[in-house]
UniProtKB/Swiss-Prot annotation:
Function, in words: Nuclear receptor coregulator that can have both coactivator and corepressor functions. Interacts with nuclear receptors for steroids (ESR1 and ESR2) independently of the steroid binding domain (AF-2) of the ESR receptors, and with the orphan nuclear receptor NR1D2. Involved in the coactivation of nuclear steroid receptors (ER) as well as the corepression of MYC in response to 17-beta-estradiol (E2).
Residues that bear Phosphoserine: 9, 21, 29, 34, 96, 116, 126, 143, 151, 378, 381
Principal localisation: nucleus
GO BP annotations listed: glucose homeostasis; insulin receptor signaling pathway; negative regulation of insulin receptor signaling pathway
Positions of region (Transcription repression): 1-158
Protein name (database record): Nuclear receptor coactivator 5
Entry's localization field: Nucleus
Modified residues (N-acetylmethionine): 1
Region: Transcription activation, residue numbers: 458-579
Residues with PTM Phosphothreonine: 3, 274
This protein's UniProt keywords: Acetylation, Nucleus, Phosphoprotein, Repressor, Transcription, Transcription regulation
Amino acid sequence: MNTAPSRPSPTRRDPYSFGDSRDTRRDRSPIRGSPRREPRDGRNGRDARDSRDIRDPRDLRDRRDSRDIRDHRDSRSVREARDLRDFRDFRDLRDSRDFRDHRDPVYDRYRDIRDSRDPLYRREGSYDRYLRVDDYCRRKDDSYFDRYRDSFDGRGPPGPESQSRAKERLKREERRREELYRRYFEEIQRRFDAERPVDCSVIVVNKQTKDYAESVGRKVRDLGMVVDLIFLNTEVSLSQALEDVSRGGSPFAIVITQQHQIHRSCTVNIMFGTPQEHRNMPQADAMVLVARNYERYKNDCREKEREEIARQAAKMANDAILQERDRGGPEEGGRGGHPPAIQSLINLLADNRYLTAEETDKIINYLRERKERLLRSSADSLPGPISRQPLGAASGSSLKSQPSSQPLQSGQVLPSATPTPAAPPTSQQELQAKILSLFNSGAVAANSSSASPSVATGSSQNQNFSTAANSQPQQRPQASGNQPPNIVGQAGSARNMGPRPGAPSQGLFGQPSSRLAPASTMASQRPVSSTGINFDNPSVQKALDTLIQSGPALSHLVSQTAAQVGRPQAPMGSYQRHY
C-alpha cells in the first residue's frame, strides 16, 4: 500500500530528551525520578512515563501535538488529572500502604534546604540554638514565633560564651551548696544530739538499793549508752513510771528492787519496736541482751535519724541557694535568677504579649513563692529547737512530789521540780516535833493572818508573819468569814514569789504529811488568781481550814530554821543523774 500518512509518526526519543547533553539542573533526590531509569519508549505515556517528570523548558517540540499527553499550559506542571489516581511512582520501592509524608526529615536528608519547591517547610536543626541577638529580637517580634523553642534565659546571647558562663555559675552554685549542706548538717546533728532522750532509765523502787542500781547503771554506761537514774516513791506505781519513761522516748528501762539486789539480777524492759519485758534476768545476761538490742536500735533508728538530718540539711541548702540567686550577684546581672520557663513568660509579659490563664497563674505562683522565701530569709536560717522536757526532771518531779490522787503525766511540770529551800534530812524529826508542839499548843498566832494584808504584796512572808505576831498579841478562837480571801491571797502570793529562801512551797521538805497533802494538792491545781475559786466546794473549804490552822505556824517555823540552812538544796524529787 502506498498510502502515506498525513503526518509522520514521531521518532524514538533520546534518553536525555532533545538536548545535546543531560540536564545539569536535575538532582539526585529520591523524590524525583532519575533520568537513567526513564523508559526510552515514550509513546506509552500513561504507564511508562514518570509521574514526577517535569518538562524541561528547553523542549522545542510542537506543543500542539495531540499525542503529547502532557499539559502544554505550564512547563512546570507535575502531573495531569489522570495521574492523580496514584501520586507515587510505580518504581518507588516503598510499600504501597506507607502513606507517610515524603517531606518527613527522614526522606528529606538529601534535599537542599534552599529548594524553592517547598519554601514554607522548615527543618528543625540544631543550629537554631546558636542564633544571634539580632535574629532573636527579630524573631521575637514575629507573630508566629514559637516562644518555647529556644531556652533563652536573658543572661546573654545563647552562644558558646553564654554556655561557659552558665557552666561556671552552676559549678559555683554546686560548691556553695556543698558548703551549706555540711554546715547545716553539723548544726542539725548537734541539735538532735542535745534533744535526744536518754538511752536507758534505771528505775529504783527502794532507796536502799541505790548502790546496786548505780553499779548496774555504770555497766550500762560502759555499753556507750546515756543512763538516767530514777527513784520511785510509794505514791506512784511502777507501771505509771514505765509508761512515763516510754512516752519520754527512752528505748530501754531497767527496774531494780530489793529482790534483784539479793539475787544480783534485774528486769529489762525494751520500749522500742515490740515492747518486751524480761524479768529477773541475771546481770550478765541482761547486759548482753541490752547490748544486742541497742545495736539493733542504733541501726534502725539512727539511720532514719541520719536520713532525716540529711533531708533537712539539703532542703535548707537549696533554700539558701535560691535566696542567693534571687538576690542576684554582681556577675549574674539584674535579670538573672529566674528559671528559663518563667523568664520567657516574664519577657512576654514585659513585651505586652498574649499569655494564657495558665501561664499567668505560673507567674503569680512564682512571685508568691519568691515573696515567701524573702520573708523567710528575714527570720533565722535554722528553725527553733524543739521544746522537749528533760526526761529526768519531768519524771522526777512527777514521781516524787505528785500526790496519789493525781495520775502520772509526762508533760506535767510541778512547782517542786524547781530547787526550793529544804531542810537537811537529819532535821526532819526535829521539824516534825516542832510542828506537832505548835499544833498542840493551840492557834497562838492565828490572828496574824487576818491582820497582815501586806502578805499578798511583794514582801517576804517571814517579816510579815513576825511583825504581825509581835504587834498583835491578842488571840482569836477561830477565823471569821472574811478570812478565806486573805488566806487564799497568802497562798497565791506564796506561789507568785517562787523559790525564795524562806517562802513555803508546795510539797514542803518533800514530806508526805497527811495534813499538808490536801493543801499542796489544791495549790498545785489552783491558778495564781483567786477570783475563779469556788468557795462552796467542800474540798476547797477543807483546804482553807488547813491553811488557816497551819499557815502562820509553818511560816514562823520557817523563819526560825532559815538561818540553819546553809544553802538551798534540791528536793528529793530532783533525782536526774546522768553518768
